[in-house]
């Protein structure tokens, strides 16, 4: 169709049609039927006006040959085909000089003989249907409507056809020829069926009374009325305007808008250096759970009781020793801390009544691990105003780290299914309205796809740990409280299960401000040997604490059980967000919902059921070096959820900066893909802003690597 349009129509008409489509963000190469329709409409408008003049006596005459002596005025003013600003300027000028009523929409022509605006319609459907649509849209007695069809029919307001028979016959013959040409190339059926009802972007709402006065008062300086401002905005050419403004600013400022082409962007530079290390507040794929099914013990639901019950399920404890030391820490202190936990748990079991909470003895190893008395003394600023060389203490620049494969493995693992159910469907009342029914249906489908997902386990684990830590921080500010890391789930068969991942010991927690830090030591069970990826565990001291019997294809095998110990810290604001990690479910559900909405608007019906139940369809999940990865709708749900969860687990200023700055580049690339011919200035500065966020954070480095894959495939 595109080739046909370029052969069939005058190049000037083709160029005008392309410009009009680009103005509304449409691509002539994709929306070829619309391209053909716009060209046809333009040609009819030009043919309507051709050869019609008004002579010196004010009579309408037809002159087909150029007579240089004739002082003739064109009978019709052509409005269609001009850019919007110019078109409205012409309309305003006509209204001012002739006293004609200003139309709400841009008409196509103005007839100086009959003194009226004309709206031309070209339809592939019944002329009377199209005429009614036009009349309904325009709602104006003053604008004359004239409709032509490809079958030779026409219809005009009050059967007043404006032009002589011969001029109209020329237009009808041309339309019939276009139809024949299309049909001979097999294009007519698609073109005929593609016509939609009357649509408009050009509606001009009349603002009157108080709103009008408020509008006139709230204009930027130098604009006297709303109309002037509208005309200015309609004709605003951003590129030249920005260059002009910048050139006024300063001689040093030099911003030339450069075209952004497929060859323009380069990959984002990732830093070199030692591989990045794990920095989450708790273990993810490497975590090991000690679990009890159908818990019914005394005090079930009290964390300490649950923890002791879980600990009793394991019989392979052995004398612990360090297998991977922490480079900068005093490793014997980590070892002693674990031994102290075991001993104090044993003490509890020997008591007659197990207490609800356990405060650890303030031993030297725990004081060291929790940074007790390590904080520099705070001095009131007023007391040191007179000190001449007062300055903030020096802090080292963070060391650059390179991307490591473990973070991609962590993400892949987070997208996988586990054999447990981590979220229950909340009991919500009966649906009342149809929209509630659709919402419930979407929520149920989505929940079914993500309830077994490992990312959902991380959410529940994060919510539990942060809630417990914040509670303890407020309730036992001076105590080194022992906090079990617990989660609850259901097995496939629906049996309840309580899991213990390890323990946290919190330090002193007089948290006045949101950002005040509480230190804690985490001790987490794992079957992962830290010596396989020592760089991942840089911040940990790892002990071997037991041997676990595991069922495998060859029978029972014994595997060493490790304890990952590290000092960490968090704040009230971080714990508050950690407690709200369930929001990740909502965020990813909304992303899925927007995909369903897009599909539904195309099909003009709710597509929720088809969307989730059509298992054969695949959807884009993300970019990898291999290209665009695709998967089932369930995989899409779980991937979006995992991204949201990792944004929460690995939240950092580096991530905030990278997300904000890389988004700008992403928008420019998408504009290029949509053929919007974007321009940029100081692209180097944007790359600098993106790359200064790539320091050492594993999740940010992985996102940057994904962004590079996207660039590669988007610009092919």
Curated annotation (Swiss-Prot):
Binds 2 manganese ions per subunit. It is found in: Host cytoplasm; Host nucleus. Its cofactor is Mn(2+). GO terms for cellular component: host cell cytoplasm; host cell nucleus. It holds the Pfam family Flu_PA. Phosphorylated on serines and threonines by host kinases, including human casein kinase II. One of its GO terms (molecular function) is RNA binding. A motif (Nuclear localization signal 2 (NLS2)) lies at residues 184-247. Mn(2+) 2 binds at residues 80, 108. Mn(2+) 1 binds at residues 41, 108, 119-120. GO terms for biological process: cap snatching; DNA-templated transcription; symbiont-mediated suppression of host gene expression; symbiont-mediated suppression of host mRNA transcription via inhibition of RNA polymerase II activity; viral RNA genome replication; viral translational frameshifting. The keyword S-adenosyl-L-methionine does not apply. A motif (Nuclear localization signal 1 (NLS1)) lies at residues 124-139. Keywords: Cap snatching, Endonuclease, Eukaryotic host gene expression shutoff by virus, Eukaryotic host transcription shutoff by virus, Host cytoplasm, Host gene expression shutoff by virus, Host nucleus, Host-virus interaction, Hydrolase, Inhibition of host RNA polymerase II by virus, Manganese, Metal-binding, Nuclease, Phosphoprotein. Its EC number is 3.1.-.-. The keyword NADP does not apply. Belongs to the influenza viruses PA family. Influenza RNA polymerase is composed of three subunits: PB1, PB2 and PA. Interacts (via C-terminus) with PB1 (via N-terminus). Plays an essential role in viral RNA transcription and replication by forming the heterotrimeric polymerase complex together with PB1 and PB2 subunits. The complex transcribes viral mRNAs by using a unique mechanism called cap-snatching. It consists in the hijacking and cleavage of host capped pre-mRNAs. These short capped RNAs are then used as primers for viral mRNAs. The PB2 subunit is responsible for the binding of the 5' cap of cellular pre-mRNAs which are subsequently cleaved after 10-13 nucleotides by the PA subunit that carries the endonuclease activity. This is Polymerase acidic protein.
């Amino acid at each position: 169709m595109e080739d046909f349009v370029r052969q069939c129509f005058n190049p000037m008409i083709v160029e005008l049609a392309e410009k009009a489509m680009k103005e509304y963000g449409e691509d002539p190469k994709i929306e070829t039927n619309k391209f053909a329709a716009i060209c046809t409409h333009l040609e009819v408008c030009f043919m309507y006006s051709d050869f019609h003049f008004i002579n010196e006596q004010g009579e309408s005459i037809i002159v087909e040959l150029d007579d240089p002596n004739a002082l003739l005025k064109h009978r019709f003013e052509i409005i269609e085909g001009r850019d919007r600003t110019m078109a409205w300027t012409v309309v305003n000028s006509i209204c001012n000089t002739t006293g004609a009523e200003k139309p709400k929409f841009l008409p196509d022509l103005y007839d100086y003989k009959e003194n009226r605006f004309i709206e031309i319609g070209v339809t592939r459907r019944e002329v009377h249907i199209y005429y009614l649509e036009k009349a309904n849209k325009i709602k104006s007695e003053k604008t004359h409507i004239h409709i032509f069809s490809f079958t030779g029919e026409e219809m005009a307001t009050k059967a007043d056809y404006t032009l002589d028979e011969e001029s109209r016959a020329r237009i009808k013959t041309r339309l019939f020829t276009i139809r024949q040409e299309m049909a001979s190339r097999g294009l007519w059926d698609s073109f005929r069926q593609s016509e939609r009802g009357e649509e408009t972007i050009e509606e001009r709402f009349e603002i009157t009374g108080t709103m009008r006065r408020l509008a006139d008062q709230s204009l930027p300086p130098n604009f006297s009325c709303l109309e002037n401002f509208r005309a200015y905005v309609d004709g605003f050419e951003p590129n030249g305007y920005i260059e002009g403004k910048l050139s006024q600013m300063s001689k040093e400022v030099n911003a030339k808008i450069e075209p952004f082409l497929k060859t323009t962007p380069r990959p984002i530079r990732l830093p070199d250096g030692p591989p990045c290390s794990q920095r989450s507040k708790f273990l993810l794929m490497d975590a090991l759970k000690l679990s009890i099914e159908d818990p019914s013990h005394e005090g079930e639901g009290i964390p300490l009781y649950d923890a002791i019950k879980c600990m009793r399920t394991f019989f392979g404890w052995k004398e612990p020793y360090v297998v991977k030391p922490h480079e900068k820490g005093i490793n014997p202190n980590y070892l002693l801390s674990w031994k102290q936990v075991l001993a104090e748990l044993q003490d509890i079991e020997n008591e007659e009544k197990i207490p609800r909470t356990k405060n650890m003895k303030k031993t030297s190893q725990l004081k060291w691990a929790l940074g007790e008395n390590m904080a520099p003394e705070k001095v009131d600023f007023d007391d040191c105003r007179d000190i001449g060389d007062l300055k903030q203490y020096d802090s080292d620049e963070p060391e650059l780290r390179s991307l490591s494969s473990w973070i991609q493995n962590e993400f892949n693992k987070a997208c996988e299914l586990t054999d447990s159910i981590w979220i229950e469907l909340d009991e919500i009342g009966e649906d009342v309205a149809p929209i509630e029914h659709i919402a419930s249906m979407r929520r149920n489908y989505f929940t079914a796809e993500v309830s077994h997902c490992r990312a959902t386990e991380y959410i529940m684990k994060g919510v539990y740990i942060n809630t417990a830590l914040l509670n303890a921080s407020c309730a036992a500010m001076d105590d080194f409280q022992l906090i079990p890391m617990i989660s609850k789930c259901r097995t496939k068969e629906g049996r309840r299960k309580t899991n213990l991942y390890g323990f946290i010991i919190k330090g002193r927690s007089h948290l006045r401000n949101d950002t005040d830090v509480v230190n804690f030591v985490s001790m987490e069970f794992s079957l992962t040997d830290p010596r396989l990826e020592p760089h991942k565990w840089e911040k940990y001291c790892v002990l071997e604490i037991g041997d676990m019997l595991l069922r495998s294809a060859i029978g029972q095998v014994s595997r060493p059980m490790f304890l990952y110990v590290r000092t960490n810290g968090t704040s009230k604001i971080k714990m508050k967000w950690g407690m709200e990690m369930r929001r990740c479910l909502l965020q990813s559900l909304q992303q899925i919902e927007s995909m369903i909405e897009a599909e539904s608007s195309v099909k003009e019906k709710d597509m929720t059921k088809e969307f989730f139940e059509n298992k054969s369809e695949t959807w884009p999940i993300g970019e990898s070096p291999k290209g665009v990865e695709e998967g089932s709708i369930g995989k899409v749900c779980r991937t979006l959820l995992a991204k949201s969860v990792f944004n929460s687990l690995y939240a950092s200023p580096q991530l905030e900066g990278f997300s904000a700055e890389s988004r700008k580049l992403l928008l420019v690339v998408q504009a290029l893909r949509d053929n919007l011919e974007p321009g940029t200035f100081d692209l180097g500065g944007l790359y600098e802003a993106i790359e200064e966020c790539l320091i050492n954070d594993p999740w940010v480095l992985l996102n940057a690597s994904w962004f590079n894959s996207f660039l590669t495939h988007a610009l092919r």
